């Protein structure tokens, strides 16, 4: 137990409690005290009596010993663990170390509590840019923490309200929680306003604009999004992907039914008319060009295949020189006969027997040369015609074809050899 007389304050440590008493230094101290005070001082100072303040010594600062009486009695604190902390507290409050036992001096304002931008602009201490940036980052994180804590308290209040309403009914908790919500919001709003004010002052020192404008600029630089008021052009990408997948799945018949349109509208979040309009445009812009491209590719493949077949047939025909020579000779002899027959038929064609005799004479001349005649595709594309019309190949009327009903023109698989097989037992040569 210890008692300290320090200027106007008397601190008593009784067990673990501290009692502060204000004393008047100009008032004479009475020697008579109550029984409780006598017992307390006897416990503190043994057989010593309570003496006036003029006998009280001084505190030797920096030492652990405290002089209490003029007769040299030295009292050491029973609890030296708390002595240093108590001295620091007293030095901070009444400034004992400087010897000023008078009135309390105002506590100096710390640098952390000052608002940057008020004193610094007047010519005071101006911190560095790095320190300001660090403080600004701390303040921003503090503001985010305040917002998170406010959300947490608000969620807790909502859970309390919901549980109370389950027991007492809807709207029964409004009268009890309205005031609490208002006070919480006011407190958090005040803290947030102070943080934003500090950030604005730091921004002024840094030579930047307002905090809100800076955030807008950073947002514009980071994200190049279109304005929210501008309407979106076209359909959403997800809806277009769903419609395009359905179109390619039903590529052969891209005409959805009403049920398909309703299903696609539910999947994409569009209306039925929007789905139908999209398919109309897609068939014109996507499906039709693809079909034309596929058709052109198939035609190119067929042409290349025909060209390869022609090259192969030319190679096979070059291996048969005998047939080539006969074909050349036959072509040289066919043309005069063909011209002769055509000139004869330029006269009135009433005498069909004369025209037929020309043809039979031509065939009789060349029957002995070979069993078949290769025309090299000369008459391959000419076909017989029905009725009594005139043939364009030989210029003969079709009435004479009745006498040659057993003449067969056969073409090989490659279309290169044409043979005329005649049976002499079924027809008669007309002179």
UniProtKB/Swiss-Prot annotation:
Composition skew (Polar residues), residue ranges: 313-322
Stretches for region SR/KY domain: 80-96
SUPFAM superfamilies per the UniProt record, alphabetical: Homeodomain-like (SSF46689)
Cellular compartments annotated: Nucleus
Region called Disordered, residue ranges: 302-333
Biased composition (Low complexity): 323-333
Biased composition (Basic and acidic residues): 302-312
Keywords from the UniProt entry: DNA-binding, Homeobox, Nucleus, Transcription, Transcription regulation
Transmembrane segments: none
CC per GO annotation: nucleus
MF (Gene Ontology): DNA binding; DNA-binding transcription factor activity, RNA polymerase II-specific
InterPro entries referenced in this protein's UniProt entry, alphabetically: HD, Homeobox_CS, Homeodomain-like_sf, KN_HD, POX_dom, TALE_homeobox
PROSITE patterns, per database record: HOMEOBOX_1, HOMEOBOX_2
Superkingdom of origin: Eukaryota
Major localisation: nucleus
DNA-binding region of this protein: 228-290
Region (BELL domain): 128-199
Quaternary structure annotation from Swiss-Prot or TrEMBL: May form heterodimeric complexes with TALE/KNOX proteins. Interacts with OFP1.
Similarity comment: Belongs to the TALE/BELL homeobox family.
Domain note: The SR/KY and BELL domains are responsive for the interaction between the TALE/BELL proteins and the TALE/KNOX proteins.
Protein name, entry field: BEL1-like homeodomain protein 5
Gene name per UniProt: BLH5
